[in-house]
UniProtKB/Swiss-Prot annotation:
Chief subcellular location: mitochondrion
Domain of life: Eukaryota
Entry GO CC: mitochondrial inner membrane; respiratory chain complex III
Biological process according to GO: mitochondrial electron transport, ubiquinol to cytochrome c
Record localization: Mitochondrion inner membrane
Similarity field: Belongs to the cytochrome b family.
CDD domains assigned: cytochrome_b_C, Cytochrome_b_N
Comment on bound cofactor: Binds 2 heme b groups non-covalently.
Binding site for heme b b562: H83, H182
Full protein name: Cytochrome b
SUPFAM superfamilies tied to this protein: a domain/subunit of cytochrome bc1 complex (Ubiquinol-cytochrome c reductase) (SSF81648), Transmembrane di-heme cytochromes (SSF81342)
Cross-referenced Gene3D superfamilies: Cytochrome Bc1 Complex, Chain C
């Protein structure tokens, strides 16, 4: 008699995805971040659901409802901080997951890769709208500044911004619709994750060497289920350490002041995970140019399969490309730092140089270095 898990219409899908899935025998801990992102999404949906039970999306009561959650709801403070810091963990895992894909050439599975980039955009949109909901000073002014960027779109810009606002400024209508979108988007993300996995399982996983691993596969369970559980335990430990010892470390003190349209905070800045993109936006003096640079700083990821000129897939055996990759990582850290600094000398020029370097490395230096390495192989 055949096993139920191999014959049952529903269970066999799970079986082919997480149990009897043939996986390369040499994938490292860098391949753990997919499952960690799944965990982060589950944590965010669950904690978000419980927060939504007590939250009110009205400008008069939103700030008070968050205070009420933290003070009066059983373990409300814990749920709120898991949700806020869970977002930071989500982005740490996202950046490492994308970085892994760039380093090991996983972008050559271009359907999987492009859906991943769409997922990144969706998560960024969700996080931005979530940041507006507590209706603190940085929530209000962040929403005002970022939505205002759309007014740079020629001809329809101003109309588009007022349409998104639902009025002539960020107000009750804006908050209500942001709450609605913030609630629905994670479920759309979950659906996209399924498609992401569907395309991944069409080809199978990449591996550190970048070589075809069909001749050397092992079952996902128990080998990688155990490995994933270890990663999950480490993630939960890191998250709970952050929440219980320093829950406001990554937040902005300005957001503990209720939103006031009449007083602008001295430095308007987004959460830390958007600072690199914010620095690129600010480094261009022209409004439309800045918005385009902001969008292309993420959209450029879709060009990686086209810009790959090396004869090898992975960077594992390409020391020159490795060097450029780590310079790119350092550049992103620099941009993140600059994004949190005031707009004054010397930060302006550092931000502009870091932004130029970011696009130059990706569009020019990495492909050129790849061609040099191809020549070195012959030599």
């Amino acid at each position: 008699m055949t096993n139920t898990r191999k014959t049952h219409p529903l269970i066999k899908i799970i079986n082919h995805s997480f149990i009897d899935l043939p996986a390369p025998s040499n994938i490292s801990a860098w391949w753990n971040f997919g499952s960690l992102l799944g965990l982060c999404l589950a944590i965010q949906i669950l904690t978000g659901l419980f927060l939504a039970m007590h939250y009110t999306s009205d400008t008069m009561t939103a700030f008070s409802s968050v205070t009420h959650i933290c003070r009066d709801v059983n373990y409300g403070w814990l749920i709120r901080y898991i949700h806020a810091n869970g977002a930071s963990m989500f982005f740490i895992c996202l950046f490492l997951h994308v970085g892994r894909g760039l380093y090991y050439g996983s972008y050559s599975y271009f359907e999987t890769w492009n859906i991943g980039v769409i997922l990144l955009f969706a998560v960024m949109a969700t996080a931005f709208m979530g940041y507006v909901l507590p209706w603190g000073q940085m929530s209000f002014w962040g929403a005002t500044v970022i939505t205002n960027l759309l007014s740079a779109i020629p001809y329809i810009g101003t109309t588009l911004v007022e349409w998104i606002w639902g009025g002539f400024s960020v107000d009750k209508a804006t908050l209500t619709r942001f709450f609605a979108f913030h609630f629905i988007l994670p479920f759309i993300i979950a659906a996209l994750v399924m498609v992401h996995l569907l395309f991944l399982h069409e080809t199978g996983s990449n591996n550190p060497s970048g070589l075809v691993s069909d001749s050397d596969k092992i079952p996902f369970h128990p080998y990688y289920t155990i490995k994933d559980i270890l990663g999950i335990l480490l993630l939960i430990m890191a998250l709970m350490t952050l929440i219980l010892f320093s829950p406001d470390l990554l937040g902005d003190p300005d957001n503990y002041t209720p939103a006031n349209p009449l007083s602008t905070p001295p430095h308007i800045k987004p959460e830390w995970y958007f600072l690199f993109a914010y620095a690129i936006l600010r480094s261009i003096p022209n409004k439309l140019g800045g918005v385009l640079a902001l969008v292309f700083s993420i959209l450029i990821l879709m060009l990686f399969p086209l810009l790959h000129l090396s004869k090898q897939r992975s960077m594992m055996f390409r020391p020159l490309s490795q060097c450029m990759f780590w310079i790119l990582v350092a550049d992103l850290f620099t941009l993140t730092w600059i994004g949190g600094q005031p707009v004054e000398y010397p930060f302006i020029i550092i931000g502009q140089l870091a932004s130029i370097l970011y696009f130059t490395i990706i569009l020019l230096i990495l492909p050129t270095v790849s061609l040099i390495e191809n020549k070195l192989l012959k030599w």
